[in-house]
Amino acid sequence: MGPAPAAGAEDYDLINAGKQPVTILPGACFFHHADSFAMMRGGHLDYCVLGAFQVSVAGDLANWHTGAPDAIPAVGGAMDLAIGAKQVFVMMEHLTKSGESKIVEQCTYPLTGVACVSRIYTDLAVIDVTAAGLEVVEIIDGLGFDELARLTGVPLRRADQRVAA
């Protein structure tokens, strides 16, 4: 999408997810939401990027409801994306506001998808979800592996510790 439209040039048929008017750049493409769900459900997406409240060591994804009584649950198309995309990448902060890891042994929030996450991008590391467990691909400068493992609280292994097949 392009920049916000000039005052008076808004086209309210062209809005973003926050219902704000947007512009498009040359070559942009968009289509009806029914077509987007057909693409998701038909397995036509190579990958998608989603946010998350929690990701389990098995790659389970919880991203639509924390169970908080004042929160309005909002699945949207996340379940379709989580199951329909060939690879699911998650982008999230590594820790909650209270300092707990969002990467958990088992999700405690309602699941969006089971064993669907391929890779986790956080503010501290890049972690692949593999059949052998969580594999740390990259860590931010200044943070050691042992400290990352302590903060995460679930078993991690370095990418260079792969078991030979």
Q: Residue spans of the language-model regions?
A:
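Contiguous alpha-helical scaffold segments within structured protein domains
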Residues: 1-2
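Conserved phosphate- and dinucleotide-binding cores of soluble alpha/beta proteins
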Residues: 5-165
